[in-house]
């Protein structure tokens, strides 16, 4: 059985050497592995959240598509498409929006960061916050769930959004009484290559220290490598290879044998000028053929458009049947005679309280207690492994709710086991609201214990 892996490509900005080594190259290599059904999409709807310059969005879409294709992405082997070419994504986004609690979106890091920044400025909490930013995690969930991806490689800053996608999928499955969606696994690339920039810090446009991937051609690459900051050791003086970010750049693009030979040359006194020339030549050996292909693609956007349209058609063959099924599930299907409707399997008559587990962005494991209507009633403390979290969930079900759940102060409550606080409830507006939530949480635990 193949593992479906979905990778989203942000369509803002022009890729640099660090993007290639840290994301593009490893993702393309992974797509060639046996048993991998790889999906790659240009996340151009997401780009509108951050950028309102149409020319920049359009140019970035072209550059990103050309870059990935030039770097070796095989559209015959993978499914490569543009987000905006799949109308089923936005339809699914609305279906998911209708089952997603606002409280879940309130906890999204990007939204909370905007609120915190506004607080620091002394302006309204939601000043400048668009619905695109606020509901971004729902669109991301639609991207993933539409194709029932098994794995989604992300950076640590996106882990929360993957957990939200799982939560939303569980809510929908539970509400409509069937496993419509696979729960995607978060794949954090712990060994992602982080290249140093010209000044030794992480290569980033924010630091203005990037080395271009294709922009500026061979001359641009040579100019950038000549501007790499080095120490003051003269030719003939031994160099400390491990302390040199120039050596780290060379190592990221060379074989082990080449890397060892370059290291010896540095330790034997190779001058920095010669070292920069050697780095340029090694990079150019890899990048020149890709750059040639990139220039060819950029000058022929119609070819890229054809590739993306073929990918979109391939993706929609999978998306359309699922959306038809979902329409039927929520009552938006084709009108049928009463007899035909009666023959359809009945939806679950009632919803139940439930525990849902998730992995936090720091790698720890937690769980939530959700009411039948999806409202969060408890969130656990972090655990080192899922087994510990699961054991505590079972213990909470076995405990008398009145003993396990107690008021913490006037506006909050917590779950206690063995004299320790193991989970906490949401903060209420006042003592009355706290008591109502506490009663609801106790009722949910009692319901689980009786199940």
Curated annotation (Swiss-Prot):
A motif ('HIGH' region) lies at residues 11-19. One of its GO terms (biological process) is tryptophanyl-tRNA aminoacylation. It is found in: Cytoplasm. Pfam families: tRNA-synt_1b. L-tryptophan binds at residue 143. Gene3D superfamilies: 2.30.29.80, HUPs, Tyrosyl-Transfer RNA Synthetase. It comes from the Bacteria. The keyword Repeat does not apply. ATP binds at residues 10-12, 18-19, 155-157, 195, 202-206. It catalyses: tRNA(Trp) + L-tryptophan + ATP = L-tryptophyl-tRNA(Trp) + AMP + diphosphate + H(+). One of its GO terms (cellular component) is cytosol. A motif ('KMSKS' region) lies at residues 202-206. PANTHER family: TRYPTOPHAN--TRNA LIGASE, MITOCHONDRIAL. Belongs to the class-I aminoacyl-tRNA synthetase family. Homodimer. Catalyzes the attachment of tryptophan to tRNA(Trp). This is Tryptophan--tRNA ligase. It comes from Bordetella pertussis (strain Tohama I / ATCC BAA-589 / NCTC 13251). The gene is trpS.
